[in-house]
Amino acid sequence: MKKVGLIGYGSIGREIMASAKRQEIPNAKIIAVFDKQSQVIDSVYNEYGDVDLFSDFDEFYNSQTYASLDIIIECASKDAVREFGGKIIESKKDLIILSVGAFSDKEYLTKLQYLSTLNSARILIPTGAIAGLDSIRSVRKYLDSLTITTTKHPKSLVGAPFFKSSKINLHNINSETVLFEGNASTAIDLFPANVNVAVALALAGVGLENTRVKIIADPMTSVNKHEIIAKGSFGQIHIIVQNIPSPTNPKTSYLASLSAIECLRSLCNENFRIGT
């Protein structure tokens, strides 16, 4: 039985916890939750009294509970990855990272990869709210171009740093509007809560600078849509994913939660895997 800890208890953390409690993840038991917000920790206690809870990372990190963990799942933010990722890897824990936008910092990515090798700890990035990362990885040496177009309802984009300097008023959008066209490195800085998928795609393929991203706001859509086009000497890959937004966080697709759950399930059943 693998002992699991969660960092962050937002919509994705709640879905992972609920799935584990329904015994849908064989060989996994969530025994700890860390979240900086004490009111969030209180809500976990009220719902699941048999889980050790922490709102201070040092207390969590130095606890006997932490020492017993096999796997930690980050489902908080890219800032949390940068703040805690190195320590977790140095403690020889396998780390599932959902806020892959943290790896727009190439130096930090290189650092974690080095620590991972040094400490024999694995870093896993779920496919998230898209599909086809296995295929993109398999043809990465043969890619000529890689693009992703993300379309979301304006309410899913509220709070994005992009709007601090843009003349576009999010609340006045009444038809499909292209907000951004550029590379994945710039996209994750301007839309950090919305395009982790672009960074995951870039890491699987041709890198952040060479992965093209278009972001569209559409007040008529009820789904989060991601369209991926990869072209090269191998042929062409065209993927369209239309996700239902998370019921508790419209910025996140429900598929992102399901992908994290499947990543944990696969990690806890190492004798049989589908896909690379």
Question: Which role does the model predict for each range below?
Answer:
Residues 5-16:
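Glycine-rich adenosine-cofactor-binding loop
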Residues 27-45:
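NAD(P)-binding Rossmann-fold cofactor-contacting core
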Residues 100-121:
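Rossmann-fold NAD(P)-binding glycine/threonine-rich loop
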